[in-house]
């Protein structure tokens, strides 16, 4: 289609007081400074503001569903501007939002992989698993095409032809998300 959107629903969702990562283990990846801010709701968000935010998210999901149904290109990204929006998990949460918007789990996976390649004009080189294409790969336990929550059950990660153990990758990130750069 001629219309492309990058809704970043999870960014909107992440500032709502009820938003939480899937389990406490995600807190281990945050720097101590960011971890302290994790439970803090924005000062401007009172009860009325939270209700307004929830309504806006519902409308945003409906808009995404309509664009997708009409052939628009939906893209996935997260804009990790909230202390609650942990990189990696944020993309999983955005895919879950795509499913709540009415896309199938397989369509949500395609949005997070194939559609980015299409938008970049690189669909002939990346974005899908096909002979002759470059691909990084995440192997998961279970079938995320039937349950998007399984996308986080990582067994192996392949990057540039090298296999990585997810536990080792996670350990290397422990306590580092949100550290100042420089």
Say what each PLM segment does.
Residues 10, 142-144, 162:
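Solvent-exposed coil/turn segments that connect beta secondary-structure elements
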Residues 14-15, 148, 167:
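Glycine/Thr-rich phosphate-binding loops of Rossmann-like dinucleotide-binding domains
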Residues 64-68, 95-99, 109, 113, ...:
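Generic hydrophobic alpha-helical scaffold/packing signal
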Residues 156, 160-182:
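Extracellular/periplasmic ectodomains of large secreted or surface enzymes and adhesion receptors
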């Amino acid at each position: 289609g001629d219309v492309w959107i990058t809704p970043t629903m999870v960014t909107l969702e992440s500032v709502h007081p009820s938003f939480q990562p899937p389990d406490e283990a995600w807190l281990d990846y945050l720097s101590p400074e960011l971890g302290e801010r994790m439970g803090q709701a924005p000062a401007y968000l009172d009860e009325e503001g939270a209700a307004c935010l929830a309504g806006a998210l519902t409308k945003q999901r409906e808009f995404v569903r309509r664009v997708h149904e009409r052939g628009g290109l939906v893209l996935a990204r997260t804009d990790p501007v909230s202390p609650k929006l942990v990189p990696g998990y944020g993309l999983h949460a955005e895919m879950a939002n795509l499913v709540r918007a009415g896309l199938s789990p397989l369509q949500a996976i395609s949005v997070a992989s194939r559609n980015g390649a299409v938008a970049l004009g690189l669909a002939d080189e990346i974005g899908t698993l096909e002979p002759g294409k470059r691909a990084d790969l995440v192997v998961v336990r279970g079938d995320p095409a039937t349950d998007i929550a399984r996308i986080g059950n990582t067994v192996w990660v392949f990057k540039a032809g090298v296999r990585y153990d997810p536990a080792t990758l996670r350990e290397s990130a422990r306590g580092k998300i949100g550290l100042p750069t420089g």
